[in-house]
Amino acid sequence: MSPMATDAPAPAATAPELLRNFCIIAHIDHGKSTLADRMLQLTGVVDARAMRAQYLDRMDIERERGITIKSQAVRMPWGYDGTDYALNMIDTPGHVDFTYEVSRSLAACEGAVLLVDAAQGIEAQTLANLYLAMENDLTIIPVLNKIDLPAAQPEKFAEELAKLIGCEPDDCLRVSGKTGVGVEPLLDQIVRQIPAPVGDADAPARAMIFDSVYDTYRGVVTYVRVIDGNLSPREKIVMMSTRATHELLEIGVSSPEPVPSKGLGVGEVGYLITGVKDVRQSKVGDTVTNAAKPSTKALGGYRDPKPMVFSGLYPIDGSDYPLLRDALDKLKLNDAALSYEPETSVALGFGFRIGFLGLLHLEIVRERLEREFNLDLISTAPSVPYEVTLEDKRVVEVTNPSEFPEGKIAEVREPVVRATVLAPSEFIGAVMELCQQRRGELQGMDYLSEDRVEMRYRLPLAEIVFDFFDQLKSRTRGYASLDYDVDGDQAADLVKVDVLLQGEQVDAFSQIVHREKAYGYGVMMAGKLKDLIPRQQFEVPIQAAIGARVIARENVRAIRKDVLAKCYGGDITRKRKLLEKQKEGKKRMKMVGRVEVPQEAFIAALSSDAAGDKAKDKNAKK
C-alpha cells in the first residue's frame, strides 16, 4: 500500500477497472466534509498549505452553518497493492430538502460510505440516504466516525449499524475525520469492496448530469458521470430532456480545482463547460449524448424539481423591488429548483411568490438574498400548494392563501408526507402526542435497539412546514431527528382564516388551516396583533373571520385625553357634555381613520416565535 499513487491514471485514458466511484452519505453534522478533507490530504490532491476546514464547501453559508448544499466531485489518486487507482468522491448534501440531488449523486456511483457519528448513532437522514443507496444497488461500507470523542460508543453503534445493513459489527470501520485515524484503511477498503464501473466504450456517448453550478466567468459548469462511450472537447452534445445542442468548450476533472483533460471515458466523473449562461439548460438528472451519434435511450430517474413550500418575499423598502428581481435572477442561475413569480399585496406592496424545496431551502435563499445582495426582506408565513375543486368541477391550484376561492367548494386536497422520526425510546409519548396534534397517522414503529426507536408517520405537509421541527427538538431535548418524503395528497376539511383590522382585510395575515384549528389560529393572531399594533386615537377592532363569520376578536383601546382635567368641581352636566363631545369626535375619527400597521408588527406577526415572545415579555412587564 502506497499512501499516494506515484503516477496517477490520466483522465480519458483510465481503464474502467482502475476507477472507483463512491459517495459519502451521512446525517447533518456527522462529519462527512471533515472526512473528505482528510481524504484530500492523504491522497495529496490538496497540499497542506492550501488546506482549510470543509475544503469542498465553497459558499459562506455552507461553511458557517456547517452544512453541504451543493454536491462536489473530486478525483483522487490512490495506490493499493502496487496498482494506481483513481477514486472519484462525490460529496452529497445531507439535508432532507435536497433528497433529489442526493439520489442523482448516488446514481453516479457504484458504492457509498455510510458514515455514522460514534457519539450520536443512527439518525433519520442516515436511514433515508441508506434506503436511497440500497435502491440504487450500491455497495455500502459502514463507517463509524469521531471515534476520538470521549463520548464515542463505537461498540454499541457498530452493533446497530450491523443489524441495519446485515453485516458483522467488526466490518464497521472505525475512523476519525479530525485526527485522520483509520482513513488509510478506509481508502483501501473502497478500492477492495466497491466494484469498478461497467459500461460500453463503443456505444453512443451517454453521461448523467448530477450537478451544475454557475461560474461568473465561464458560465455553467456541469458535473457529469459518463455511463457509455466517451466525450471529447470541441464536439457537439445534446441534452436529452430539452433537446438543446451545445458545443463542448472544455472538459476535465476536478482534483479538486478544475483540471482540463482530453476527454472523459466510461465510468469517469468530470465537468463540462459549454458557455451556456443558465443552469436550467443543464438539469440535474438529465442525459448528455453526442449530437453526431446520439443515443436513443435516456438514462432513467430524471424528474423536474417540484417546489413544495411557497412563501412571499417583499422588500422592506419598496424601491428595492428591481434589485430583488435581479438578485433572484442571479440566484436562479445557480439553483434550478427555485421558482418565482411577481405578486402584489395590499399590505406589503410589490414582491415575489417563491417556490422552495423545503424550509431549509427557504432559509438559505433568504439568507443569501440578504447577505450577497444587501436586501432587507419580509417573508410571509410559508404555505403549501393546495388543489381546490369547486362545485362546477373546476380545479384551482392555490399557492397563496389570498387566492383561495370564496364560495362553493366541493373538495380541498393537501400534500402529505411520509415522515420518519428517530428518537430515544423514553420520548415515544411526547413524539406521538405531537404527531397526533398535527393530524398524523402512525404507519409503523420499530426498535433499532432497546433505547432507540423509529416511528413512521403520514402527516400533512402544511403541519410540518411551520414549526414542527422546533417542537420535535424541544420535546425530545434535541435528541430526535426527522426525515420526510412527499407521499401524494389527501382530501381535508380546510378553511381560510382572514384577519380584519377595522373591518378591512389584511391579505398578508390570511392563512389556510384545518377547520378544527381555525379558532386557535384566529385567537392567536388577534392576540398577537393586539400587542403589536400601537394604540390609535380611536378604538381598533381586530377580527379573525372564516368567510363572513367572525371567530375571534380583540380591541386595541383608544388613547384618550383627559378632557375633565380643567373642570375643578363644577356641575356633572358640564362634565357629561365634554365627555359626549369627545365621544362624538372619536366616532367621527373611527369612520375616516385608517390603521397603519408598522413594519415591525408585520415582521413579528409573520415570524412564529419572535412575536409570541415579545407579547409574553410585554405581559410579563405589565
From Swiss-Prot:
Identify its membrane topology class.
Answer: Peripheral membrane protein
Which GO molecular function, any one, fits this protein according to its record? GTP binding
- Give the residues the record marks as binding GTP: 29-34, 145-148
List residues of the tr-type G domain. 17-198
* Keywords tagged on the record: Cell membrane, GTP-binding, Hydrolase, Membrane, Nucleotide-binding, Protein biosynthesis
The family note in this entry says: Belongs to the TRAFAC class translation factor GTPase superfamily. Classic translation factor GTPase family. LepA subfamily.
Q: What is this protein called?
A: Elongation factor 4
